[in-house]
């Protein structure tokens, strides 16, 4: 005979002196699957000795024509107190947490740690184990070093571009002062032409202008 009910949170146990009957899960795969779905137990697989008690069925689900209480062929369990079961699980979880917190910490707590070790301890809860956290830290340190290198390269390029612009501006101004370029032309051409002119081209232009002896009138 069955010993207890398989429904979550149900404490019904077989006793011939109480008016509760127990019923096996259907053998028909479709009906059996529907029962399992309604029971709503995670990873639940009923066996041949798995039962539900009569408290989970409506009165219309029973065939009372004989001497024993039997379920009709289309009967499905629809009466469950899931709220009580969830509250019970939460209560057990809180009690377990209180029990774990009641144990005093063991081992020395005043060890001096370096920066990487401190970060490892503070954030190791996000990883499965400390070694995984340490590998993650090493990877992040490499990424930071790579970004710093790229930043340094960008700054160097920016400084070179600034120096090139200053040299180009001074060169055009000198040509303008020596009447090799019309007055005021620098304000027109510098913002557009010289910004994209390579330094090598400026040097070539400077050499060409030095070879000229006749100024522009």
Swiss-Prot record:
SUPFAM superfamilies hit by this protein: Glucocorticoid receptor-like (DNA-binding domain) (SSF57716)
Zinc fingers (THAP-type) by residue: 1-80
A single MF term (Gene Ontology): zinc ion binding
InterPro entries linked to this entry: THAP2, THAP_Znf, THAP_Znf_sf
SMART domains from the UniProt entry: DM3, THAP
Gene3D superfamilies: THAP domain (6.20.210.20)
Keywords carried by this UniProt record: DNA-binding, Metal-binding, Zinc, Zinc-finger
Pfam families: THAP
GO CC, any one term: nucleolus
KW Amino-acid biosynthesis (keyword) present: no
Protein name as it appears in the record: THAP domain-containing protein 2
Residue ranges of the motif HCFC1-binding motif (HBM): 122-125
Protease found in the keyword field: no
């Amino acid at each position: 005979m069955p010993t207890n009910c398989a429904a979550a949170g149900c404490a019904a146990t077989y006793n011939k002196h109480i008016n509760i009957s127990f019923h096996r899960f259907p053998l028909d795969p479709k009906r059996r699957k529907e029962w399992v779905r309604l029971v709503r137990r995670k990873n639940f697989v009923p066996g041949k000795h798995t039962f539900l008690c009569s408290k989970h069925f409506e009165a219309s689900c029973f065939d009372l024509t004989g001497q024993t209480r039997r379920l009709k062929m289309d009967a499905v369990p629809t009466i469950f107190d899931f709220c009580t079961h969830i509250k019970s699980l939460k209560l057990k979880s809180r009690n377990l947490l209180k029990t774990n917190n009641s144990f005093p910490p063991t081992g020395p707590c005043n060890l001096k740690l370096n920066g990487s070790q401190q970060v490892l301890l503070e954030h190791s809860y996000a990883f499965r184990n400390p070694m995984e956290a340490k590998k993650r830290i090493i990877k992040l340190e490499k990424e930071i070093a790579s970004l710093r290198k790229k930043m340094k390269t960008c700054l160097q390029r920016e400084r070179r571009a600034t120096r090139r612009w200053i040299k180009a501006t001074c060169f055009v101004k000198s040509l303008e002062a020596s009447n090799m370029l019309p007055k005021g032309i620098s304000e027109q051409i510098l913002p557009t032409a010289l910004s994209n002119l390579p330094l090598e081209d400026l040097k070539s232009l400077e050499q060409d202008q030095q070879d000229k002896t006749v100024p522009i009138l």
